[in-house]
Structures are given as structure tokens and as C-alpha cells.
């Protein structure tokens, strides 16, 4: 098999499949016109194109050969192709089954060295096993050597073809091939040798044949020799193959006999073979292979009833058997077919010779005109092959179209010539046989098959319809002539402009027409119409006259275009790839070099040129058949889309909206991205410049991520199709180049993320926009590729950072697969243990166990992409969950249960109730009134899973852009790249990217010259013919557009094609033409149209002359007007130029500044890069050190392990020896002990026997045989006569009894009594001790004292709330340890006086255990302690959690105490996990139910007998460290308590735990409480009043007008906005305060109400505070009249009051203020004008704003009632709570700063000073510009005494530099003296008077320190001070008053004096700093 063959399933035989549909007239073309043509069908050729309209492609079973569209070909001595062009077919006799030579067209240069016996034929037919192989022959430079034969006379028939309509894929009627592949040359073609014969005839050719000679087992091919022809015939490119306009070669079938046989055949045999070859054709079975995805496949003529012809199955003859047997052998085996073909050629040449002479003479008149439309070949010959005719094309159509082209070239009246030529060529076709009509001028909206079929179907039965919208025409075929005539008569009613003509298939008079069944019903058109060739022309004909070398693309070029059929790739026996490459390099380099400089103006021309370049390069490529030498493709494309594809898709209008220039349909080369092309069997191997390397792929993906991913404003369908298609293209390039590295992995990962995102984002889109199944398939392919790449990289030692993420995605995508866990176990340990894979495994467990609660919780906690994958299972899990709920909540099938719909929405994570209702209804359940009726019998399972909707919970997770999601992180920078262009600014091809792609040639092609009869006229004689291209090159890729011939002809091409050997015979007489009435009517119509056109041209010429005369008269008037207007325009232009010059200078300055900034930036970047380099070096060093350390550690561990193993071995051996010894010793001791025990046992038995005998003997001796009959008191004496009687008391006390002779007996009666009494006493003591101990152990804790003692800090009121978290002990027995501990812990925190009955909470929620409210002392301070204890049993239900959040049970909690249940010893890990998970669930429920801030401390009580690892086990089981890191708890401690309550150890532990909780409780909140009115007033007074009144006083004392009202109002509103933001801060919402149990409605200073920080309440407070704002007011114009200004002021004041009742109050105040202003102004103006009044600057705007503010504060009412009723206190006030520190963050608005700065500037100008100490008021002081008042007072006094003093500016205006310097020094000295004097006076006053803070007001500094601001009564005298009064008298009076009121000691005076001095210094420093800051601001 051939590894490079795209059809690897084919054997290397010539034509191994019978399904290849190749013939003259295949009845069903397998593709629509404009699509890629499968080889073997007629490729449609546009009449406007000079190249191919399709590139034929064929399936794997096809055995056809490909023909390349190269125009220049030089055959080496091994070439065995004979160049022939037939009338209807171009067939080549190929004698080899190896890879057939790609037929090329160009200068006719051949070099045949080896002699061979070849017959020359006018028709070049290819021999093959079947009619499935074509090798189009191209003409090169011919040098033939023929041995003359006397009877071999051939006359080429070239006059019947019309070049614009001829296609380049011409199929011979007979095909033969020979099975045995030859190895005579790399091309595999047999050599030829022709004797060269020269003839002066231009129309006939004599050929001589010699017996063929076999060379290297190759059969000879037949190649004709043609004599040189004159220059005139050569230049008629569109008409002639060999230079004649009418001569054409027809193709004939050739017998499969051996070539060496004599050529004997009859005419009948030739004709029969021709007809058989034509008729035996069938369409290809695989029609649509290789078609583009977006191309329309419905317009194929195959859908319109084309009748298939029979298959052609010619015999195959050769020296060796065929490589593969043909599939069908149904053709009758005829004999001497080769001879019949020769005879038919003889006769055909004789018949058409005369017609060729006539046409040759006729075309001599317009040779010069035709040359302008031909290819411009510098010094070369233009007699090259014209495009071949497609089989089945009508000769009449060819002639008519050809004549139209000739007329256009002549520039003469062409229509008459066209008609004459058309009618002359009708031949034997009768008008009654025409069954088709042609409709012209059809509008686009009517030019549709459906509309036309409906229209003509009403008239007659339509067979088929072909449309061409670009030409506004359509061809309609009927079944008979009568139907066509009726349709032609009545069909014009469709549209008024439509014209209908007969559509006839014209047949050449020199050929017998084939029957309709034998003809292919389509011509070579690009459009769907197959029979409208005569009406189409080349689009490149216009550009041909403009371009020189670029005229290669001209349709009317005389170059014979090669066939569209591709040269099929065969595998020869053996050939050297190096020699092949060297031989094929010469013509490739020359061909590519000739393309340089070719002009291609349009995108279509550029595409054709680039396509021709690619085809040449494909032919020059070395085809490797050895797998060992196979190499991986390496892409070299630098653009996101290859250049050829950009032009191709622009030509075909296949551009996306993201790739075009906005507003046009032109391609945006910078935005075009390579389109995905589906792989097919007929595709060529890609060239390097068609593949993008990895950096370009990465840049392409970056472009898609940054520029496309987030552009979803338009159609989602276009967006998804574009991104999906382009990412598939990236993946295909990766696959073709076999890329595998981390960057490649990242590209595939981004593709995967895109598909995961679309799986959820596009799930609601219709099937036409998004197919989830296809998306999942692509996602699966991406994940599979990633899996393989991860494995390959891991084998190389490379680990990918995102492997765990995508392995997790793979698991999530396969949750329904049963063996997914087995695949997970095969992951790398690091991947398997990652959080992503663990999450996927958890999802698998939840889905397969139908744990829908767990599943949806995982969805809520998952990342966005994980959630998108889990979204695919929503329908499945919801269906299973609904089934489980329906079964669980219903008793039987007869009874239904009502279930709340909200619960379903919450549990199954629906978007809303509507979506849940739809889902439930789909499953047969009824929903009504917010509830669903669960019923087992009504439950239905719909077929399949319903289409899920987008989930809002997943959408919320998309917190970043889609690009960042797909990129997996922040977006990369936007890629910048300039696309590569192979054309310069003059649209000339420069070929920049070709050098790197051509193979290096080591062999120069041989040169051979041929003399010709036209060398003098056509140019320089050629020196070296172009060698043949390698014939084993891969077939070109299918292309649905015409492929332009791009190889330019070189000057070295021979001027002639063939040299005719004998003078031709005279041509036969022309046939008599036949005309019909319809033809005459058509001619008349055309004559009328031509006459009308000439008349219109005359009228237009007269009108143009008149217009020219009128323009001449108007020019004089125009000159006068221009002269008058020029002066004004010049002035305006001069002014504009001046302004532009200024702007230019400003821009230069800005550029200089930008350059400076750029340099600084570069410096910073260099420093940063150095820093990064150092950091990177350190990081690398750290990594190497870490690796070294890890290696050393590993070695040390291994060494230590070996040592340990050795030591363990020794220990084990010693231990075993010890065990053996112990066992032996034990056995010995055991035996000895057994013996001793045996001895002792028998000895003891002996002793017992002896004792028993003694006792029996004593009893028998002492005890009577019967009881004695004596009194009880005498029985002792009777029994023991010798005993003591009575018993002595002393002996009895001693416990002795004297029995006389029997001895003394000791008794213990009293001792037993004493022992019993003692024991009973001790038992009583122990009982009471245990009872007391139990009472103490069960006693309640003194919580108030504990809290007061251990609470950090000092507080007067303490609120402490503890939550006990107890296990669920309801199901345990009363005697169980866990229940006892829970009850005991509740008793410890209950207390007698503090216990309460919590009836508000049910048993499943949180209960209030106790409340304490008492006074406790801490040191000498009494503290009010309020303690609340809450208790929670077990895990809370959802309803209980909702109740907790609603009732705010956990609000204000200060600590948590968790009691774990006693742990049962068990080895089952599942039970242990359940134990810890239940405790963790209970704890997390409470932590999540409480407010987020603050985090609480946690105490964990563990009942255990004791252990070392208890604390570690608790930390791991409850994940306490994670809770701390998540800020759910602040700290924790684990306390072990005994599991039984029998001592005080448990109480001590609990006491310590409470102390720890109190000491670690959250700090109390620093909240301030004020009423709303008080808060607003204090805030305004603190931030607004000081600034406002100071500014007002400063301006008044400085004699300035009032401040602008806009700045004052903006300052006031800014303060209110600040106050509103403080009181409604978002951080208040998360505070867990107050304690719910102690809070009161309306709130208090200690505790706010429960809803104080609710978002609704805070929003209401913000709105209420903002309700104090004033509306904006702009200052009226300075010259505004008084009355309108007053009206405006009154109207503004009317907006302030909140009610109509208070509006008159403010209105009267405003009117009073205006009246006083008017009176003051009137007093200054003795005789005011009527209606006049104060100016705008004289109106006291500050007083007006002050009145409005005061009224607003007094008259304010809330906009509406508070949201909650608890916000109102008992007295109707609303308390607000805020942080005190937040009030210190106010920033003064910029407008007020500017207003203050303007005030300072105005004061400076007014006082005539250059600089004064500026004022910068702080936030909480009221500085007053008294220094200014003092200076103004002094200046006013001096001016009153001395008159006006000139200002400083007046004095310095005319001074010199020395005078200015002296003036500056003098002024500086005066300032210093004045400052010194002021300080001395102030100090003297401080020392002399005891005024302290009540010193001289005029001497106060401008900048008051903080220490003096508190003396607010210093403002009062200033408020009353008038400018006209004496400051000294006021000062003395105030000082006396203060002196009388102050009676302080001397020490206090000194301290106060020191404080004043310090404050003065601070004020000076602050003043200087502020002044410098203001000066800097001014400079900026």
C-alpha cells in the first residue's frame, strides 16, 4: 500500500474500481455545480473562469488519475504522454499502471530520446481497464522523431471548440491501461521517439508510426506529432489547440490489443467503439465525499432525474495480469479496438480539414485584438493548449460561445458573427427535437427551482430545471418538444421583463452527434445550471488587457488548460525518491519563479494564483512510500488562517460575521481564523504553509478567548458555530502535526472548557443552533485526547498541572458508567487523591445511590465547570428523586398526599415554582394552590429525559467572563500580529513563503531546442525545456472554485506545438445550414436591439456635446466667483493654520512628555525585569536545593530503613530465643509444680482423714446419744460437767469459755457486734457523702459571677449568651450514659432563678434553657450581668433551621459548647464516620444559621475514660482547623470529661470550659446610639457648620461677597450623604447583635432592637437621612435683574418645606432677608431707578442657605414609616446605631476646596498681599479669620487718615530688578517685624492678664489648634463685633469680664500659658504646611 496515498484501501493498479464514473456523457453528475467534483464526472466549468470550476475528488474505490492544472510542462526523455486535444474529449494513451503523469498545459515542449513505435493520433486517449481513468495531456515543447508512413495522414479538427465554455477535465471515450507497472522512469511513463517532419501546412498533419518498442517493461503510449503552424493560428488561443481556430482532435476508443500490431480498423468499428465508450458510464457511488460542511448539497443535478448511463468496461490487455480485477466486466469484448480508433481518426481528420482552413483564414483579421485578451508571455510563444471540452458538450453551444468571445475580442459587431457561426454549426439537429427553453432577465426572488417548477408545471410536465442567479437566467427541460413550445409561448406571464429562447445543444458539423441519452446533460458551469454555457464569459477577461504576466489567469488565454481530473496516485515497483525529487524540482522552481510579479487584483484572482502555487508545490513534493522515511508534518503558517483560505472563503462568501470588515463582506485578514475541514479520503496531504505551528495555534486560541468568547451580542448560533468550528480546526492541526507537549495540552484543555461551558449555557437553544449530543461528543473526544496526552507526557516525566481537573471532568461526564471507579483507581496517586477527582467520586456516589439531597448540595458547592457537567444529570436525578418522594410520602396507591411545592423547588433545585410545576405535570402529578398531590397511581415516567433548562444557581457561579473560564485563569494579552501577504501594494505576487517549502534540487533539467517555423515572430528560441513534474505527487485537495493556471510561460518555450509531417488535404465542403422560423425571429429581435442601441448611443453623444459646451460657459462665471471668495477663505485658512501651528507645538510638547514617561516606564520595566530575574534565579535555586534535599533525604531514609531492618532481624531472633527458653522453663516448672501439687493433695487428704477421725471419736465420747431432759440453764453442766458454771463475766468479756476438761473455747460475739456496728456507721457515712457529692456535682454553676470575673475588659453592662449543642438522646434509655450526661450538663447551666419555660421553640429547634440578670462585682466595680443559655438537641431539620433564622435564636451568641455522645468501641470505620459526621453536621448547621460576624469560640466536651490521642482525633473528626480557617469559629478547645458522674471531676472540667469561653468571647461592639434627629444635627454641626460659618465670617470680614450657593449646598448634601453611608453601612448587616432575649422594641442605648441592622431598615435610614438634602441652586448671571432674581429665590425656598403649613414661615423669612438686602442697597443708592435692585453679588446667599438649612432641620418629616414597627421607641423616637470611628472618615468635596481656595485668592488680591497664611479648617473646630479682621481694621484706619495708598502691584509695575529686590527685602523685613511685634504683644498680654483662653481676639492666629476649639464662648464676642467699632474697647471690656469671672491660681495660669505657646507653635507649623500644599496645587 502507498502510505501517502489518501486512498490507502486501493491497490496500485491503474483503475481498480468499476464504480468510477468516467465517460463522455455521465447522466447523473454527483455534485452540485460549484462544489468539488468527484473524479469521473464532468466538472462544470464557468464561462467566466479561466481555470477549473471544481477540483475532482474521488472515493477510495475510484481508479481515476488526477490531472493538475499546471500550464507549463516539460517532458524528459522518460515521458510517455502524447499531447492531444479532441473536439469533445482529451484523452491520453498511458502505457503504465504506475502513477500517471499529471497532465499540464503550457508551452509545447517535449523531449523524447528513446525511440519507440508509437502511433500518432489526433486524439489522446488514455488506456485503462475501465472508463475511470483519465490523464489529460499537456503540451510542452515538441521535438518528435517520426518514421514516415505513407498512409498516415491526419488533419486536426480544432475549430469547433469555444474556449470560454471548455472545461479542463475532458474524458476520453475509450480508456485502456496495462496492468503491469513500469519502472522506466520516476514518472512511470514509457519513452517515445518520433521522427520530426516539417510541413508548411497549418491545418493538416501527417503522422508516421513505427512499431512500438517496449522499454523497461512499459507499454508504449501514443503521442502525435504535429507540424509547425503559422503565427496567426498560434495566437488564436480560444479556438485552437495547435494554433488553428477550427481544428480539433476528437478522441476515439482504442483497442486493447498490443501496441505493436498494425493499425487496421474500419470506420464502423471506430464509431461503434466510440459510442460504446461513451454510453458505458455511471456516476460515482460516493458522491458527497470531501464536500465542505457548509456547502449546499441539495442543488446537485443528481436530484433532478438524470438518467445514468451504462458502465464502461473496456478490455485490459498487457504483458502482466492486472493488480486488481475490475468490479464489473459487462462490456462486450471486441477485437482490434485500437485499429478501429486509428481508422476513425483518419476519417475524422479528413472531414474537418476544410473547416479548419476556413476558420483559420477567418481569424487572421483579429489576431492583434485577440492577443490583448491572451496570456502575456514575454518573448514566448502563445500557442499553448486551450481548455478541453467536457464530454457531452454540444457542438452548437461551443461554436456560439466561441464566436461571442471572438466578437468581444475583435471589437466589431459581434452578434451577427455569433449568429452566423451558431446557425452554421447546427449540423443535423432539427428544431423539432429541442426540448429545453432558456429564460433570461429573471429577478433573483423568482429565480428559484421551486417557483419555476410550479410556474411551468402548470403549463407542461417539467423534466428538470437549472438556475443561475448571477446571470439572471434559467434553463428548463421538458420531456418533449411540444411541451417546450407551449411553455415558451405561455411562460412569459411569470414576469414582464423575462425573455424566453430555445435552448439547443449544438453539435459540430464534423462529428456525428451522440444521442441524448449518451450526452451528459450539463456543461462545465460553476453554477447549478449545466447547459447555459453560451451565455457566460470569463470574469478575468477585463483584467487581461491590463496585466502583463498576470494574464495567465485570463480565460481567453490560448493556453490549453489541463483537465480537472486529478492524477491518481499509483505505486510503481521501485523508484528512488531522491532522483524523483531532483527531476521534479527543475520545472517546479522555474514554474514558481514565473509566478513572481503576476498581478492579481481581486480576491478571486489571488486565490487562483495561490492555489496554482500549491498545486505546483504538491507536484514537486517527494512522495515517500517507505514508512521508515516518513516524517511528521511541521506547519509553517504564521497566520491564524492561511492566506489562500482567506481569499477562497471571501470569494465563496463563506466568511463568518467575526471575520469580515464591519459593514462590508470583505475579509478582515487580521481576524480570519482557519476553518475546520472535515477529513475525507480524497483530500491531499497538507502543505507546510497550510498548517499552523504550535505558537500560532496558541495565538489563535488567545485571540478566540480574548476577542470572540465574550461577543454574544448577536446570534448565539453564529457565535457557537464559529468558535466550535475554529477550535475543531485547532485540534485538527494538532492531530496532523502529532503535537504533544504542555502547551498543546493547554489548547485542548481550553477546547474542553468551551464545550463544558456550552453544555449549560446553550442548553435552551434550539436544535438548529446547538446540538447537545454533538457537543458532548466533541467534549468526549477532547477529554480522550487529553487522557492520552497526559499519559504520553507522564511517560516522558512531564506532569501537567491541570490533569486532576480534567480527569475529574472525565469522571463527571461518565457518572452513568459502571466501571468509572475502576478507571479512577488507575489514576496516578496524586491525581486520584486530588480534590477534583474526590469531588467527582462523591458526585458518582450521590447519583448512583439516588441521594438527590447530597447531589444538589454538591452542585451548589461545585465550581462553575463542574456544575455545568452535573447539570446534564438534572433530569435524571430529579426523576429518580420524584419517584422516591412519591413512594415515600404516600401510603398506598389509592391514597394521595399533599406536599408543599416550595419543598420540591428547594430540594430539587428548581429555578422557580413554574419550572417545578412543568416538571411535575410532565410526570402526571397535579399541582394546585402551592402544593403538589403525590399519588403512586398517577405518577408517570415520560419517554426519555426532558430537556433541562438553564439553572440560575449555576449561572450565578459565572463570576468572571467566559474567556477567563475557557482560559482557565486571567485573560492573556490581546495577540497582535500582522497577517502575511504574498502580494505587494501593486497586487503583484511576490512569493515570500515559497522558498522554505521547495525541495532542494541537485540535478538540473536537460536542455533541448526545437526549431520552428514561428520562432522569428514569437520570441527567443527556448534553450531548456521544463522537465516533467514528479508523477507520484499527492493529489491536490478538492476545491469548489476554478483553479487558475498560475505557471507563467518562460521565454525559453518553443514557439510551436507540433511539426506536421505532410501537407494536409483540402478540407471537405461545409454542410448546408438549416434555419427555422424561430431562428429567424430571434435574429430579428437581436437586430432590433442592436439598432436601438446605436440610436441611443447617438442621442447620448449629442447630449454629451451639449453638456460640454454648457460647462465651458459656466467656467468663466465660476472663475469670477472663485476670485471673490478666495480672499475670505484665505483669511480663514490663515487663522486655522495659526491655530494648527499652536496645536502642533502643544502636541510636540505632549509627545516629549510622553517620551519622557516612556523612558521612565522602560527604566521601571528594566528594574522590574532584573528583580524578576533575581527572583526566578532564587526560585530555580530553591527548586534545585529542594530536589537535592529530597534526594538526600530519600537516600538517608533508605539507609535508615536498611539499618532498621537489620536491627529488627536481630531483635526478632533474640526474641524468638527468649520465647523458646521461657517456654522450656515454663514446661519444666509446670511439671515440677504438678508433682508438688500431687504430693500436697494426698498429704492434705491424709490430714483431713485423721482430723475427721479424731473429731468423730471426740463427738462420740462427749455428745450424748439423745438430748438431755434438763433445763436449758443446766444443759451446759449436763453436757460438760467440768465446765465453768456460771460463766464469769470477765472471761465472757475476754471472749473465753472454760469447758473444764475439754479445755478453753474462745468466742467473738461482742467483737462481731462491734464490727457490725462500725460497718453500719461507715455505710451511713459513705451514703451521706455520696449524696452530698451528687448534690454538688449536679449543682448549677454561678454563671453571673463567672462571667463578671473572667470577662476581659471593664464594662458596666455585660451580655453573655451560650449555646449548648447536645446530642439527640430521645431514642436512648434513661439509664444510658449519653442521656445522663446531657441532662447533667443542662442542670449545670440551668439555675433555679434563671430557668425559663421556652414555649416558643418546639422540641426540634433551639430552646432557651435559662436567663440570668444580676449584679456582680469585679474588684470595686459593680457589673450588671445578663446571661442567656440556649440548648439544641441533635441535628436540626430544615423547618427548625428556618425557625432559628426567623426568630433570631442565635443572635448575640458569645460561645458554643458541644457535647459529644459517648463513643462506642467499634472497628467499623463506617460507624465511626457516621459518629463524626453527625456531630459535624449538627455544629455546621448552627454556625451557618447564625450571623457571620463575629466568629465564636467553641468548647468540645468529650466523654471518654481517657486517652492520649483524644484531642487529635476530635480535631480531625470535626475538622476544627478548617472551621477556624473558614472563620466560622474564632478558637476552640477540647475538654475530656468522665463518662460517669460520680465525682467533681466533670464539674471542674465544665467550670474551666466556661471560664475559657468567657475569656475568649468576642469583644463588645463599639456602637454609638443616638436618635435620628440628634444624629443628623450633630453630624451637620460637626462637619458642616464649622466650615460654613468660618467661611462666611472670613468673607464678610474681608469685604467679599457671599460664597457661591452651589458650593455651600454641595457641602451640605455631601455631609448628609456621608452620614447616610455611615448609618447604613453594609458591615452592620453581618453583626450578631443584640442578644435576642434581652432586646426591647424601639431599642435602647445598651441594646438595639432586633431589626436595627436589617437591610430594609438600613435602606430606610439612608433614605431618611438623605431626605434632609437641599435641591441644587445655580448662581444667576451677574447682570440679572433684581425682580427675576427674587422670584427665583422665592421659588427655590418653596421647595424646602415638607408641608404647606410650614411653607409661609420660611417664605416670610426669605422675603424679610431680601427686603433687608434691598433696603441696605437703597440706602447706598440715593436715587435708584425703578425696577433696579441689588446685584447678584450683593445678595447674602449664605444667609439664604442658612435659613433653608435651619428650616429643613426643624421641619423635616420622614418620607414614610419605618419598615418595622420595632424601630419606634415608646416616645416615638428612632434610634440609629453606628461606629464612632466611621464619623472620622469624611472627605470634603472638591467644590468646597475650590471655593475655599478662591476665597483665599480673593482675600490676597483684596489686601494687596503676595502671600498670606492660608486657612485649612479641621473637621471639628471653628476657626475665625480674626487676623484678617485686624489687618483690615488697620488698613481702613490708615486709609481714612492718609487717603488711598497704592497697592503693591501698582508700586512694582514699573520698578527695575534692583528695585524689586530691595522692595522684596523690605517687605520681608516688615513682615518679620510685624510678626515679631504681634508675638511680643501676645506674650505680654498672656503675662500681664489672667485671660488664658480669653485673650485679645484680634491677636488670635488664623490656624486654631485643637486645644482651643473647645472654648466655644470665644465665638460669641466675634459674632457681636462690628467692623466700625473699636476693637480695643471691646477687648478691654471682655477681658475685664473674664478676669472677674476667673479666679485661678498662678500655677494654673503658667500651665495655661505654656499650653497657649505650644498651641501657637503647632498652629504655625500647620499653617506653613498647608500653605506649601496650596502653592503646589496652584503650580500644578
Swiss-Prot record:
Disease: Peripheral neuropathy, autosomal recessive, with or without impaired intellectual development: An autosomal recessive disorder characterized by early childhood-onset of peripheral sensorimotor neuropathy, progressive distal muscle weakness, atrophy in hands and feet, and gait difficulties, often with loss of ambulation. Most affected individuals also have impaired intellectual development, although some have normal cognition. Additional features may include eye movement abnormalities, claw hands, foot deformities, and scoliosis.
Protein known as: Germinal-center associated nuclear protein
Impact upon substituting residue 1272 to M: In PNRIID; uncertain significance
Quaternary structure (record): Isoform GANP: Component of the nuclear pore complex (NPC)-associated TREX-2 complex (transcription and export complex 2), composed of at least GANP, 2 copies of ENY2, PCID2, SEM1/DSS1, and either centrin CETN2 or centrin CETN3. The TREX-2 complex also associates with ALYREF/ALY. Interacts with RNA polymerase II subunit POLR2A and with the transcription elongation factor SUPT5H/SPT5. Interacts (via FG-repeats) with NXF1; this interaction is not mediated by RNA.
Region ranges (Acetyltransferase): 1658-1790
One term of GO molecular function: chromatin binding
Superkingdom classification of source: Eukaryota
Similarity remark: Belongs to the SAC3 family.
Gene3D superfamilies, A to Z: 1.25.40.990, 6.10.250.1340
Region Interaction with PCID2 and SEM1: start-end pairs: 686-1003
Catalysis performed (reactions): L-lysyl-[histone] + acetyl-CoA = N(6)-acetyl-L-lysyl-[histone] + CoA + H(+)
GO cellular component assignments: chromosome; cytoplasm; cytosol; nuclear membrane; nuclear pore nuclear basket; nucleoplasm; nucleus; transcription export complex 2
FG-repeats: annotated span: 33-340
Modified sites of kind N6-acetyllysine: 489-490
Keywords assigned by UniProt, alphabetized: Acetylation, Acyltransferase, Chromosome, Coiled coil, Cytoplasm, Immunity, Intellectual disability, Methylation, mRNA transport, Neuropathy, Nuclear pore complex, Nucleus, Phosphoprotein, Protein transport, Transferase, Translocation, Transport
Region of interest: Disordered: 1-67, 212-247, 266-432, 511-557, 998-1038
Class of the enzyme per the UniProt entry, highest EC level: transferase
Residue numbers carrying Asymmetric dimethylarginine: 32
Region (Interaction with ENY2), start-end ranges: 1162-1200, 1207-1235
Entry's EC annotation: 2.3.1.48, 2.3.1.-
Outcome reported for the amino acid change (mutating residue 867 to D): In PNRIID; uncertain significance
Lineage: Eukaryota, Metazoa, Chordata, Craniata, Vertebrata
Expression sites by tissue: Widely expressed. Up-regulated in germinal center B-cells in tonsils (at protein level).
GO terms, biological process: mRNA export from nucleus; nucleosome organization; poly(A)+ mRNA export from nucleus; protein transport; somatic hypermutation of immunoglobulin genes
